[in-house]
Regions:
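Conserved glycine-rich FAD pyrophosphate-binding loop
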Residues: 1-161
Length: 161
């Protein structure tokens, strides 16, 4: 960044510090329970209610209270699509709760995928599910990784392999 922005002398230096530390303390997402699992994807806006109902229905099979489910819907592309995000908050010290959240996210993500949700940035428990279904994509990622990192020293294990 430039040290000064037009009309705002010295803001460039201040802005860099603000961007590096947007808030003090832990992330707002860890405050409710200590940890969270996100399930996010792209969908058609008219499918949002169906997907929310599906996840709430899946929750009835588990002990996780649906009132603690975080739901975020962000219209994109002038509302031709939307990003939908489900956040499952849990106590990272409670192994049973952690395992239950992983099971919920995996079941919900798999069902959402079957119903047309587009997981364009696989994350968490959905990584193996998405990459297993996208063999050509995975093979292409491996070839690209090999071109730029022949010795596999940059972030080994962080892609789908």
């Amino acid at each position: 960044l430039k040290p000064a922005l037009p009309g705002f002398p010295g803001l460039g230096r201040k802005l860099l510090n603000i961007l590096k530390t947007p808030w003090e303390g832990p992330s707002w997402k860890t405050v409710p329970a200590g940890a969270f699992e996100d399930l996010f994807f792209i969908a058609r806006p008219e499918k949002a209610n169906e997907y929310i109902a599906l996840v709430k229905e899946i929750l009835t099979k588990y002990t996780y209270p649906h009132t603690q489910l975080g739901v975020y819907v962000q219209p994109i592309e002038h509302n031709r699509a939307c990003q939908i995000e489900f956040t499952f908050f849990y106590d990272p010290e409670n192994e049973a709760e952690k395992a239950e959240i992983a099971a919920i996210a995996l079941e919900a993500g798999t069902e959402l995928l079957k119903r047309g949700a587009q997981f364009t940035r696989p994350y968490g428990v959905m990584v193996p599910v998405i990459y297993d279904r996208a063999g050509n994509y995975t093979a292409t990622l491996k070839r690209l990784k090999n071109i730029f990192d022949e010795k596999n020293i940059l972030n080994p294990g962080t892609l789908c392999f």
